[in-house]
Curated annotation (Swiss-Prot):
This is Prolyl 4-hydroxylase 1. One of its GO terms (molecular function) is procollagen-proline 4-dioxygenase activity. The chain crosses the membrane at residues 7-27. Its cofactor is Fe(2+); L-ascorbate. GO terms for cellular component: endoplasmic reticulum membrane; Golgi apparatus; Golgi cis cisterna.
Length: 283
């Protein structure tokens, strides 16, 4: 074998071994975190086993297991707008939950799509330049995902069964999502659960410049969006925080003021997880 080929072969072997080791470490992290959550919760025993074991090493809520799962005392709500209705939930996810969602999603990321108003199907578009994936129905039954979904249901007051599958997204530098509404303009998507009423957007990283969630019709001041000064309100990505906002007004009609976008990422990576909630059960 020629010396040049030996060098190339050696580099390929090194990279392959590194990828295998990385995957094994990632799998070990997922397994450890899953073990720490046990197999069920008091209100969800019909979905999993009968025995219940919760997060270890949480002494503050040693006598209140539901409070552990809901992170009562940790989550700090902040109302940033009443019209449209926007609430930032600080420390909504634990650091471990953020890493868990990223670990599940990373191997399955694909180019993100948007809903075609004519067909109701996902299509690629320059409106949205990220990569993402949806959790499966099987993954939805995992204890950690159950805990997150139960927390979303409690803080949003929308039943868990009305929620779509969680979507995990990654935005790299120069990627963005142009302003849009989460509610549907087509009739195809309304057949499964009706209209979208609310969104829970959860941030999984914060080592990013730019990438704010921008509401151009909220508030009457200025904000920062991808390094630019804009009219409206923006929320900076902070690991563990979540933004809860409603696409439907108190009158039961879709709220055009809920238009929002993902500002351009200037540096770093922005990871997020989104849960859309409907008027009725989605399955």
């Amino acid at each position: 074998m020629a010396p040049a080929m030996k060098i190339v072969f050696g580099l390929l072997t090194f990279v392959t071994v590194g990828m295998v080791i990385g995957s094994l470490l990632q799998l070990a992290f997922i397994n450890r975190l899953e073990d720490s959550y046990g197999t069920g919760f008091p209100s969800l025993r019909g979905l999993r086993g009968q025995n219940t074991r919760y997060l270890r090493d949480v002494s503050r809520w040693a006598n209140d297991k539901d409070a552990e799962l809901l992170r009562i005392g940790n989550v700090k709500p902040e109302v940033v707008s009443w019209s449209p209705r926007i609430i930032v939930l600080h420390d909504f996810l634990s650091p471990e939950e953020c890493e868990y969602l990223k670990a599940i999603a990373r191997p399955r990321l694909q180019v993100s799509t948007v809903v075609d108003v004519k067909t109701g199907k996902g299509v690629k578009s320059d409106v949205r330049t990220s990569s993402g994936m949806f959790l499966t129905h099987v993954e939805r039954s995992y204890p950690i995902i159950q805990a997150i979904e139960k927390r979303i249901a409690v803080f949003s007051q929308v039943p868990a069964e009305n929620g779509e599958l969680i979507q995990v997204l990654r935005y790299e530098p120069q990627q963005f999502y142009k302003p849009h509404h989460d509610y549907f303009a087509d009739t195809f998507n309304l057949k499964r659960g009706g209209q979208r009423v609310a969104t829970m957007l959860m941030y999984l990283t914060d080592d990013v410049e730019g990438g704010e969630t921008y509401f151009p019709l909220a508030g009457d001041g200025d904000c920062t969006c991808g390094g630019k000064i804009m009219k409206g309100i923006s929320v900076k990505p902070t690991k563990g925080d979540a933004v809860l906002f409603w696409s439907m007004g108190l009158d039961g009609q879709s709220d055009p003021r809920s238009i929002h976008g993902g500002c351009e990422v200037l540096s770093g990576e922005k990871w997020s997880a989104t849960k859309w909630m409907r008027q009725k059960a989605t399955s």
